Amino acid sequence: MLTLLHLLSAVALLVWGTHIVRTGVMRVFGARLRTVLSRSVEKKPLAFCAGIGVTALVQSSNATTLLVTSFVAQDLVALTPALVIVLGADVGTALMARILTFDLSWLSPLLIFIGVIFFLGRKQSRAGQLGRVGIGLGLILLALELIVQAVTPITQANGVQVIFASLTGDIMLDALIGAMFAIISYSSLAAVLLTATLTAAGIISFPVALCLVIGANLGSGLLAMLNNSAANAAARRVALGSLLFKLIGSLVILPFVHPLANLMDELSLPKSELVIYFHVFYNLVRCLAMVPFAELMARFCKRIIRDEPELDTHLKPKHLDVSALDTPTLALANAAREVLRIGDAMEQMMEGLKKVMHGEPREEKALRKLADDVNVLYTAIKLYLARMPKDELAAEESRRWAEIIEMALNLEQASDIIERMGSEIADKSLAARRAFSEEGLKELDALYDQLLSNLQLAMSVFFSGDVTSARRLRRSKHRFRILNRRYSHAHVDRLHQQNVQSIETSSLHLGLLGDMKRLNSLFCSVAYSVLEQPDQDEERGEY
């Protein structure tokens, strides 16, 4: 039992090492890798090579598939080139399996030692993340060595020998067991290595080993399908296409396993080495043969998985790519783009508010819907940012993280205020057949125009971080407050003059002035984040 636990822990260490390498590479080169993938879609050979290269870096075809599916889900990459990239990823992971199974036991402690020094010394820097990659590679090599050590006593047990001795006849059953190995270990590499070790120990025959390798490849396709089961239709098509390619390859090669085994037996190499080489060349030949059929497979997948009908009319997040969370700069940029979409919705709310002020009560319903849309986007941004490893962010990234969440919160609060303003105008003015005085409506329009201008400038400052624009926004905030105070006094003067319309709408009018003042403060608060003024808190607190 203890030996089995050692094997399971070694497999877990292999998966964890792969995760650490992927995380480190994505944080250092994530944006560049995405650029490579997105720009390699014009020609199939480029897409194929991009899949190989990216997978070699991130140590996982599943990670590359996740990146590609996120692109397809956002309509950044078409399905056909995405399938070609995934085929390249399968070749890349097979090549890395060959490299990692060389005798590199001396390299493991060196990589871990140097990696820890860099990672702990400069954790949030580029060098620190490269140290993380070194730790991950060292753990992978250590895990591979531990797997070999753990399997050896297991293979000597009589019960295990009896179980594996039964794997001699049914090639389909052998392939399914290989797929099960890959799913249980969450890694086709671990399954292939286990197969090679069992072959070297003489526990399983060489033909059975080839079937297990073929099944392990199929299992990795099933894993990708399971990982994307909750994704949208576009992302599921990529996973389905990858699985079908592997299924077709398995069905084609399985009948020829015994002739291939007899042919490879003539090579003067250890059986364990032959298993690894078969894994490499099988994936290489299969993927190269499938590339010309990528477009046909894309059409088939679109027929099988159709676009889902849009039942929910609410605005939905478009840029919150989960696979970008390992690349903080990219994830923050995605969240910022989503905040800009909230800004667009806020502009629509401002336009609707003006229509309500001018006697169009139907717009009040549209304001409620837009407020719900803003809340949906704000919640999505908040949850997305909460999934980022905030403790590992660099100082600048941490500041930007706080800036994004604060801006999203301010806009969400502003949307609630605008929704309430529209409702109060409809209830107190339009329903009661009361109208603002001509002078009062002009003043509200002037404040509205200034407020809309400040909102647009605030979104520009938020996205660009331009100091000059931030200073201009701060000045605009002060001008708005002066104008708001002047119009409040003007309204009181009209009350002294016994203006009937002003008297009837007085509480509503003054309430709108106060709400606009609060909106202005919420919009303009981003200026202080950029300028980092010492009197920031004092200025923000004044409404």
Curated annotation (Swiss-Prot):
One of its GO terms (molecular function) is sodium:phosphate symporter activity. Keywords: Cell inner membrane, Cell membrane, Membrane, Phosphate transport, Transmembrane, Transmembrane helix, Transport. This is Putative inorganic phosphate export protein YjbB. Might be involved in phosphate export. SUPFAM superfamilies: PhoU-like. It catalyses: phosphate(in) = phosphate(out). GO terms for biological process: sodium-dependent phosphate transport. It comes from the Bacteria. The chain crosses the membrane at residues 1-21, 76-96, 99-119, 134-154, 175-195, 196-216, 238-258, 274-294. One of its GO terms (cellular component) is plasma membrane. InterPro entries: Na/Pi_transpt (IPR003841), NaPi_cotrn-rel/YqeW-like (IPR004633), PhoU-like_sf (IPR038078). It is a multi-pass membrane protein. Belongs to the YjbB family. The gene is yjbB. Its main location: membrane.
